[in-house]
Amino acid sequence: MSTANPETPNSTISREASTQSSSAATSQGYILPEGKIMPNTVFVGGIDVRMDETEIRSFFARYGSVKEVKIITDRTGVSKGYGFVSFFNDVDVQKIVESQINFHGKKLKLGPAIRKQNLCAYHVQPRPLVFNHPPPPQFQNVWTNPNTETYMQPTTTMNPITQYVQAYPTYPNSPVQVITGYQLPVYNYQMPPQWPVGEQRSYVVPPAYSAVNYHCNEVDPGAEVVPNECSVHEATPPSGNGPQKKSVDRSIQTVVSCLFNPENRLRNSVVTQDDYFKDKRVHHFRRSRAMLKSV
C-alpha cells in the first residue's frame, strides 16, 4: 500500500518557477543574463531590417492575443535586430521559446524577456562647497625695526559655481595665508634696516633749482678797468625837491669785485640762484627803506 504525498499550491508554483528559470538560463544554448523574468513576454532576436512591427504582430498572433510589439532601434531609428512581443493572456512562453521559427527565411532567436536587475548604484548628490572666508592675509616685512608696517590685501571673492575646488589647509606660521585651489610657495625676504633702530625716519626732498653761473672773463691786471654801476633812479614825489637816492645792484657789484680781485675769481665765479635771489631780496628791502626816508 502506497501513500501519495499531496502537493500544495505553493510547492507547485515554486517548482514551476524554478523550472522556468532553469530552462530560461540555458535557452537555446545561450546563457541568459540574471534578472526578473517578465510574464507573458517573449524576446525575439535576429529580426531582419525589412521586418516591421505589423508583420511580427500578425506572425505571433497564432500563440495568443498580442498586446504589444516593440523593436529596439538606435538614435537614428535603425533597428538593432531584436525586440519584444507581449501577450494579453497567459501563454506558454517556454513552448514558444522551444519552437523553431523561421521568418522570411531567417531563424529567429527566441527567449524569455528578462528585465535586468538594477545594480546598487549609490547616487551621491553633490553638495555645495562652503567657503569660510578667512581674515585677509597680512604681509609683514621681516626687519629688526620694532615699528613694523602691515599691508592688508583685499579679500578675494570666490565664485559660487566652482563648488569642487579642494582648499588646502593653511599653515599658521607662514607670513602669507591664502586659501586657493593650490598651495602657493612662501618666500621670506630679509633686508637689513637702512636707518638706526628707534630713529625717526625723515625724507629730505632736494629743492629743484638750476644753478645760474656767472663767468667772468680774464682781465689783464695792468689794464685799467672802469667800474660800471647800475644806478636806479627813484621817482621823486611832486611836493619835495630832495636829493635822489642811488642804489647799486649787488649782482653787478659781485661781477665788479671779481674783476678787481683776480685772486677771488674762482671763489666768486659761480653765483647760485639762491644767492642771487637772496641778494635781490636785500636789495628790495633797502630800496623800500630808501623810499620811506625820501618821503
Swiss-Prot record:
Modified residues (Phosphotyrosine): 276
Domain DAZ: 167-190
Pfam families on file: Daz, RRM_1
Coiled coil: none
Location in or out of the cell: Cytoplasm; Nucleus
One GO location term (cellular component): ribosome
Chain segments carrying region Homodimerization: 80-132
Composition bias type Polar residues, residue spans: 1-10
SMART domains: RRM (SM00360)
UniProt KW keywords: Cytoplasm, Developmental protein, Differentiation, Nucleus, Phosphoprotein, RNA-binding, Spermatogenesis, Translation regulation
GO biological processes: 3'-UTR-mediated mRNA stabilization; female meiosis II; germ cell development; oocyte maturation; positive regulation of meiotic nuclear division; positive regulation of translational initiation; spermatogenesis
Primary localisation category: cytoplasm
Low complexity biased stretches: 11-25
Annotated GO MF terms: identical protein binding; mRNA 3'-UTR binding; RNA binding; translation activator activity
InterPro entries according to UniProt: DAZ_dom (IPR043628), DAZ_RRM_vert (IPR037551), Nucleotide-bd_a/b_plait_sf (IPR012677), RBD_domain_sf (IPR035979), RRM_dom (IPR000504)
Tissues and organs where the protein is expressed, per its UniProt entry: Testis specific.
Keyword RNA-binding: yes
Residue ranges annotated for the RRM domain, each copy included: 40-115
Region annotation Disordered: where it falls in the sequence: 1-25
Record's subunit section: Homodimer and heterodimer. Multiple DAZL RRMs can bind to a single RNA containing multiple GUU triplets. Forms a heterodimer with DAZ. Interacts with BOLL, DAZAP1 and DAZAP2. Interacts with PUM2.
PANTHER family, alphabetized: BOULE-RELATED (PTHR11176), DELETED IN AZOOSPERMIA-LIKE (PTHR11176:SF4)
Family that this chain belongs to: Belongs to the RRM DAZ family.
Domain remark from Swiss-Prot or TrEMBL: The DAZ domain mediates the interaction with DAZAP1 and DAZAP2.
Function: RNA-binding protein, which is essential for gametogenesis in both males and females. Plays a central role during spermatogenesis. Acts by binding to the 3'-UTR of mRNA, specifically recognizing GUU triplets, and thereby regulating the translation of key transcripts.
Protein's name according to its UniProt entry: Deleted in azoospermia-like
Organism: Homo sapiens
Lineage summary: Eukaryota, Metazoa, Chordata, Craniata, Vertebrata
Gene label: DAZL
